[in-house]
């Protein structure tokens, strides 16, 4: 807990354990935090992990987290998320050289554990668009490509991206932050 008036930390405690390489994540309109793992490491690697990683976890502002990965939101190199406060749709960035911009359509707004559909952004009429060479300042229609297997058994860093890209999804390079304002999700990319 942080006291904004005094600038002092009042209380500090762990809210989640058992995750790996957590990155930006983001807040939800219903008062929780989505923390994102920026790795797909798992058992059998050189890190001695018991469980696979590369997921999003929800951490309530008050109370205990379940430490259950939200597997239908995808297993990939996550960076950040933002949430549309009206629909509950979650937008997700991926931080690697060949990266996708994803959205998760929850089966039930505000209850991500109820499952849903993961999709990857595609530019209409420009399948497999490489945004590193795109023209700036041009509005382009988009659509979304379904990800049929958001939690592949032997996941690599590119497993989910390859599915979306194969369906015509766009390639970004190292997506970082994302924010939802008004009716739009904004994203920033490190290298295109």
Regions from the language model: what does each represent?
Residues 1-192:
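Sequence/structural signature of beta-propeller domains
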């Amino acid at each position: 807990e942080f006291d904004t008036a005094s600038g002092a930390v009042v209380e500090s405690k762990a809210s989640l354990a058992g995750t790996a390489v957590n990155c930006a994540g983001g807040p939800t309109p219903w008062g929780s935090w989505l923390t994102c793992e920026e790795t797909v490491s798992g058992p059998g690697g050189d890190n001695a992990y018991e469980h696979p990683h590369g997921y999003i976890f929800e951490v309530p502002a008050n109370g205990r987290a379940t430490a259950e990965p939200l597997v239908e939101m995808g297993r990939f190199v996550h960076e950040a998320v933002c949430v549309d406060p009206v629909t509950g749709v979650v937008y997700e960035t991926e931080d690697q050289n060949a990266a996708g911009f994803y959205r998760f359509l929850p089966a039930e707004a505000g209850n991500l554990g109820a499952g849903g559909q993961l999709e990857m952004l595609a530019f209409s009429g420009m399948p497999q668009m490489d945004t590193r060479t795109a023209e700036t300042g041009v509005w382009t229609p988009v659509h979304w490509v379904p990800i049929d297997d958001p939690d592949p058994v032997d996941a690599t860093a590119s497993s989910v991206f390859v599915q979306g890209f194969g369906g015509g999804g766009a390639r970004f390079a190292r997506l970082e932050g994302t924010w939802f304002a008004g009716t739009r999700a904004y994203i920033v990319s490190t290298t295109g």
